[in-house]
Amino acid sequence: MTAHDQELRRRAYEEVEKKEPIANSDPHRQHFHIMPPVGLLNDPNGVIYWKGSYHVFFQWQPFQTGHGAKFWGHYTTQDVVNWKREEIALAPSDWFDKNGCYSGSAVTKDDRLYLFYTGNVRDQDGNRETYQCLAVSDDGLSFEKKGVVARLPEGYTAHFRDPKVWEHEGTWYMVIGAQTENLKGQAVLFASDNLTEWRFLGPITGAGFNGLDDFGYMWECPDLFSLQGSDVLIVSPQGLEADGFRYQNVYQSGYFVGRLDYNKPELKHGEFTELDQGFDFYAPQTLEDDQGRRILFAWMAVPDQDEGSHPTIDCHWIHCMTLPRQLTLSGQKLIQQPLPELKAMRRNEKKIHINMHGSSGALPVEKPERTEILLEDIHTESGFSISIRGTATFSFHKDEGIVTLERKSFDGKRTEARHCRIKDLHTVHMFLDASSVEIFINNGEEVLSARYFPFPGNHEVTASATGKSEMNVGIWTLM
């Protein structure tokens, strides 16, 4: 570790010591989501299950609530409920990452943990340079940087980042999000026999592949894995135009299902499907744990989307992760469900049956800033709605076959909405934290995630219907 690296870490810890008490005094501070101690959190990085613990690294800017030269922060857990903050994993201290240790991934080999990340560099004229870098650890806590292992191939701009690494039949592969020189987004592949020397194989898909036309000017945060006999590519394309209810956020995150031919190499796949229908979801990354489960974490925000309006900025922090979600395939569709381990947080269970007929009433929610609500056995003539703390509303419009999530904008000046189409509604599973809501529809067929910032004194959660609606409701306080 260089003297400059030590100095950056010292300054970051000093910032935490100075500002974390202010951050923790914020009524919007989350109770059961990963968030930064201070400063800005964005993409989950290096998510991995290793030696009995889940590791989630994250993009972290400790000195401000705007983006800048990123560190890698680090949390671990053994039960996916109680998270421990570990020491800083990476600091932007070397010539190859001096403007940020950008996103990447983790793998294990010979009982060591290998972190791959993008070193972001600006030259003296402000021009971007990009390097794919490696750091290695014996204990999973302290990492030794090994420097650059892959450089920019011809035909691409320096928007070339976010390596995700895995092993297949004795060879290591790395997928990277890329932008071609003619400003088209692609996912490209490298291969290695030893994790330190990488050869460029070429693009596997992108704009102009598999029937895709112009499909964004940049693809970020690719993740490629096998699931139930198919290959799944998760990616966050930038530059998609809104299309009906689709692509409503500034940038998108979604997936393709298909088959990767490692010899060509080429990914043959179907259409792109968004992972989350809500307001705040980006840069997802997955791991496989010791039970063989494919688990996803994502950043509960979108770059360049109202970030400056978050009220938490006044308390020196911004952003959080989604809850971890287990992924399964149903045909060509990814199903996302909250991990069963989260049930360990449940306290004060209430089970009720509600029957509404052109009426409304408050649900017996004790702590709406830390609550789980499960609606089951739903029967409704025309639909119903759930209003959450006067700031967000979930509604089902049966005739149109649409579910809607509305919220007050962060500046409080307007109401915003996101919609998705469903054939029928059987279950609604809500997780309400101090400043977020995640809603799983029909056991994870669709998910809507959003940050929201209710008035701390408003604790009311109400259900209403214009026609006849009845359902069974489970409510838990989450501790």
Swiss-Prot record:
InterPro entries: ConA-like_dom_sf (IPR013320), GH32_Enzymes (IPR051214), Glyco_hydro_32 (IPR001362), Glyco_hydro_32_AS (IPR018053), Glyco_hydro_32_C (IPR013189), Glyco_hydro_32_N (IPR013148), Glyco_hydro_beta-prop_sf (IPR023296), Suc6P_hydrolase (IPR006232). It catalyses: Hydrolysis of terminal non-reducing beta-D-fructofuranoside residues in beta-D-fructofuranosides. Pathway: Glycan biosynthesis; sucrose metabolism. GO terms for molecular function: beta-fructofuranosidase activity. Residues 1-28 are annotated as: Disordered. Pfam families: Glyco_hydro_32C, Glyco_hydro_32N. PANTHER family: BETA-FRUCTOSIDASE (PTHR43101:SF1). NCBIfam families: scrB_fam (TIGR01322). This is Sucrose-6-phosphate hydrolase. The lineage of its organism: Bacteria, Bacillati, Bacillota, Bacilli, Bacillales.
